[in-house]
Amino acid sequence: MITKEEAQKIAKLARLKFEEDTVEKFFTQLSTIMDMIDILNEIDCKDIEPLTSVCNMNARMREDAVTSSDLSSELFDNVSGNSTQLAKEVKYFITPKVVE
């Protein structure tokens, strides 16, 4: 159980401001929460293994394989117009000017 002064200190540290009529409600709710935490702390959990996953599924892993990631030749095969060759050489898309 916490005191009313402790509840006010917690509210101040959390930068919470309450009207006078809601301070009592905050104190009651915080007291209830702290009582629930005390009940949970009474449970003996020292022989219980931590839960690593909610579901017992094994991740399906794939083998890592090194592959070529230079797809620029395939990418620039789709370039059309009179700047096709230049686009393939510099590996940039050449577009009309959009902003003046």
Swiss-Prot record:
EC code(s) of this entry: 6.3.5.-
UniProt entry keywords in alphabetical sequence: ATP-binding, Ligase, Nucleotide-binding, Protein biosynthesis
Gene3D superfamilies in the record: Glu-tRNAGln amidotransferase C subunit, N-terminal domain
Cross-referenced InterPro entries: Asp/Glu-ADT_sf_sub_c, GatC
Pfam families the UniProt entry points to: GatC
One example of a Gene Ontology biological process annotation: regulation of translational fidelity
GO MF assignments: asparaginyl-tRNA synthase (glutamine-hydrolyzing) activity; ATP binding; glutaminyl-tRNA synthase (glutamine-hydrolyzing) activity
Record's catalysed reaction(s): L-glutamyl-tRNA(Gln) + L-glutamine + ATP + H2O = L-glutaminyl-tRNA(Gln) + L-glutamate + ADP + phosphate + H(+); L-aspartyl-tRNA(Asn) + L-glutamine + ATP + H2O = L-asparaginyl-tRNA(Asn) + L-glutamate + ADP + phosphate + 2 H(+)
Family in the record: Belongs to the GatC family.
Biological role stated in the UniProt entry: Allows the formation of correctly charged Asn-tRNA(Asn) or Gln-tRNA(Gln) through the transamidation of misacylated Asp-tRNA(Asn) or Glu-tRNA(Gln) in organisms which lack either or both of asparaginyl-tRNA or glutaminyl-tRNA synthetases. The reaction takes place in the presence of glutamine and ATP through an activated phospho-Asp-tRNA(Asn) or phospho-Glu-tRNA(Gln).
Subunit structure: Heterotrimer of A, B and C subunits.
Protein name as annotated: Aspartyl/glutamyl-tRNA(Asn/Gln) amidotransferase subunit C
Taxonomic source organism: Rickettsia africae (strain ESF-5)
